[in-house]
Amino acid sequence: MGFPFTPHPRETTVLSKHFGDAEARTLDGWKARGGYRALEQALGMDPLAIQAVVKDSGLRGRGGAGFPTGLKWSFMKLGDGKPHYLCCNADESEPGTFKDREIMRWTPHALIEGCAIAAHAIGAETAYIYIRGEFTEPLDVMERACEEARRAGVIGKNAMGSGKRVDVWVHKGAGAYICGEETALMNSLEGKRGNPRIKPPFPAAAGLFGMPTTINNVETLAAVPPILVNGGEWYKKMSRPDNPKSTGTKLWSVCGNVMRPGNYEVEMGFPFKEFLYDLCGGPPKGRKFKAVIPGGSSVPIITMEEADRALMDYEGMVAVGTMLGSAGCIVMDDAQSIPRQVARLARFYAHESCAQCTQCREGTAWTTKILERMVAGDGTAEDFDTLMSLAEDMTGKTICVLSDSCAAPVVSGLQKFRGEFEALITRRTVHTVPAIVA
Amino acid sequence: MSHGPSATGGSAISTAPNGHSSEPYVPVFTGETKARLDALLERYPTKMAALLPALWMVQEARGWVSPEAMAETGQVLGLTAAYVKGVVTFYTMYHQHPVGKHFVQVCTTTPCHVCGAEDVVKAFLKHTGCGELGVTSADGRYTVIEVECLGACGFATPVMVNSDFIESVTPEKVPELLKQYG
Amino acid sequence: MTAPTANTPMVNLTIEGRQVSVPAGTSILEAAKTVGVLIPHYCYHPGLPVAGVCRMCLVDVEKAPKLAPACATSVAEGQVVNVHAEKAREARKGVLEMLLINHPLDCPICDQSGECELQDYTYQEGRADSRYREPKRFNPVEDFGGDVMYVPNRCILCTRCVRFMDDIAHDAVLNVSERGDRAYIGKFEGKDLTHPWAGNVVDLCPVGALLSKDFLNKARSWELDRTASVCNGCSQGCNMIVETRDNVVVRLRPRPNNQVNDFYLCDYGRLNYRWMNRGDRIEAPTVTSASGQRAADWDVALSSAAAALKGKRVFVLASPSLSNEALHFLSRIVKVAGGKGAFRMPTGPEAPLPGVEDLALRADRAANGRGAELMGFERTDQPLAGLSQGDAVIVVDHDLTPDDAASLSHASAVVLVSTFMPAALARADVMLPIANYVEEEGTFTNLRGHVQRFLQARAAPGMARPSWYVLADLCNALGDRQDAMTAAQAFAALAAAQPAFAGMSYDGLGLRGKTIAGATAGQASLEVAT
């Protein structure tokens, strides 16, 4: 459903079916809605068989990278004698994205169930759900749900009487966007600064506490129970006929200048134009859409011409020069200044850079300073070249992709809305103070 | 956290007084709090992993994380004070200085920015009497800061007051909202 | 990376057109070094865990989608690495520009100038100008305690210092504080860099951010003459470089040697140099006769000394910081004349560097106690015990306690071979001035039996001569023929006569030394036992 609004008939509610339904938050309520059947089933299955079902479903990571989930699980070497860990990435902090928050607020047991199944499938006895510290309500709901499930023996040292141990613990973050990066999250969970790690080693070889680890997004894990109950084939069918690479339903967070902001669950391949105008209600009265950042702030901005022909799946978004990312859709209307918004985004990344890599630490801040100077009316023609050259330096050269994410909207903004930037410069104020030349 | 006019505003090295008082430091991790921490330690294979939760306990108990508390937390978990400080300063939610009785965080990242979050910030600064970001009001009741994405973009503008998460705040709603936080 | 063993398979690759064969697991950066290619880098240091954060060592690896950080990328069979590919050079140019945007560019007043990797790589491949037009970040200078000062504006956050304190010193007093471009190297108020090995962070810092307070504004690096030497502060024998300006020692720095001190030198050692420049030296040979003490030329002084010693039992009080060569010639005198040689060992608290195996500031605060013992000298608190009427004494660069001085009054003759005049010494029949160890060449034997050369770093004052040269001459004057015109000849004489040194040659020692046969075996079993 387009929570907080009533569901649109064209939505396919799998994950969002019980959003707004307070009873679904309790263990009994969840069981009454068919919950924990999948876990019961899974605990009786061979881990490899669970992996096979998930592989077959075509489920891909919903955190942004879109890596096939079943394949990721299969990297875990079962029976290697080491403790394995599952991390659930609930550090949802990509601007524009707020879907995991609703999953945790309304269907905490869906996530616990998904975690427990995944833990069993990768040979882990412990799962940590890392929730960002600002999510006070989801933290509270998840803590209570875990406690309830633990008391009822659904999880714990003898999960559902299966003799298998599955502990699920909630871990509270403390304010750092970068902890949504998987290796930064592991460092943070270990009690360190949230610095991303160099890969290799990959988490499946040496992750949390140096042990084999799988890390999955909230939405990914919450999708696992219905897949197990209904089968991979069922999930796979929810896709474009001409694109089997993106399957299932996807929660889209929609925000910005739109009539009905909220979370919408649609099948992969849904037409973006219809989505924006029919489901989300189009632009505010008297306004027109101008640009969309469809996959969270880290993906390139697209124009409405591009948005109108986009299809809402991984490949469909790539086809119009952007990415599905975390499906956090930021819509901007014709009252917005693109340079101003790009500058604001750059500032976000400058604030959140972990400070490890030179290009990110210095580049995000420098980019922000240039953009803010341009917005303040003090830009020069050379700034275009400098920004593009900085973006080049910040792309593909650092440990993680935070600096790439800062560069993406800058480059796409400059390319697609260059006129707005140029207007800032032609109108620019005359220097009264000589520029400081380094 | 940077609140200056540019993304890099503010001197990184804090020379501000830390609210040191002449009273002797009272440890946080005693009695029930210590028992809670001990229980927590069983969830993790290392003591260090309990650092973030332990710092949360400190902040709950004291309202901020003082240097003395960093040293104590380090001692309890077998870490140096400098290490703990490095971690504390990485995460924006730990207060390195005392803040007002009600700590107001207004999201101003792009999705909220396009929906007018700046005006919400202004309304808070006006109605709390803080006047400036990061400054505690004269009566000690409020501190207002801008915060990066709170993850509730569809409910612009989300605001956190202490641990309460309030959605869809507009400048007009601010005076009424503040009445709940006297 | 775990250390390669004999069974580690070799990997073949091409770096800058050169064929390279290295053990699997080697980084591209280290592999390149083996064929003389230095890949620019800041955060990487062979003694520290890999951080991979400065992004300066980005190189082009053919068929790889992205540039690879050479420090954090292991070699692979058939890899073709182009360090100077256009896109790699552009990437590094970008890094250099960014490292300088907030840098104060204050090279004229920076101690690091001339030995600064930021300067070096910027000259080598950086931009000629900067495109940065915004205000620069500013943070005040901070005293980190110990001998270390932090200039955050020059800091590139490579974190070598933080990693050294964490992983090598096991005393995590430094951290990275804050994040983004507000980040800086921080410490906790009241917890200083007082670890006995903390001074190494100054050497590890590739730029002028961490400076030695002791060396502050003392000299420009290009005015310094550098000499390979060995620290004589304790029995560890850390390899070091003596830096002099106009014949004055101004700084001691570690010289890497993975058999002894890895890359490090302790604070005690590095600050223990002022005595090398002391002005109150014995500068001319003297002979004391009925008419009083007179300056003499070397021939007269040596024959007078021989005359004073001849036919007597000779006690030698020798400093445990004398070279093996000097001790050898002294042992000859003892052997020929009968008598004994002894020394007193100054001691202090031991201070290990836990991250490096078998490295510590040792309790024995002299360089060559082991050498002295091998040469038959006795370590004792009563070095003149047993001295009887009629015996002669040679005091060689050894300080005297009042008790020693009292014992000396029984001696029939006292010959002082020394750099300085011991305060308690009442009389010396002959005084022979010698060079201190940074004014001469020679070898020390460390506590594990590792024999290492040190070279001459400054000129000796007045008529002072190398200790081994003087003592060989004294042997000759006593009729014991010794040939020691050069340090190599002196060592050859030692190696021929002392069984422990058999088979060693001065040239063969090189600048990293050789271990006495059998000396480490005992140590190895000791380590296994503990």
What is each model feature region?
Chain A
Residues 65-73, 97-100, 139-144, 179-191, ...:
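Short acidic, glycine/serine/threonine-rich loops at helix termini
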Residues 139-268, 280:
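Hydrophobic alpha-helical positions that pack around
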Residues 114-118, 268-285:
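Short amphipathic, charge-patterned alpha-helical segments
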Residues 107-121:
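Histidine-anchored nucleotide/phosphate-binding helix
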Residues 37-56, 82-84, 90, 99-104, ...:
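Ferredoxin-type iron-sulfur electron-transfer modules in oxidoreductases and energy-metabolism complexes
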Residues 54-75, 118, 173-187, 191-193, ...:
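Conserved phosphate/anionic-ligand binding catalytic regions in large, soluble enzymes, centered on
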Residues 1-51:
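Cofactor-/ligand-binding subdomain signature composed of acidic, glycine-rich
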Residues 24, 30-37, 88-100, 203-209, ...:
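Gly-rich Lys/Arg/Thr-decorated short loops/hinges at beta-loop-alpha junctions or inter-strand turns
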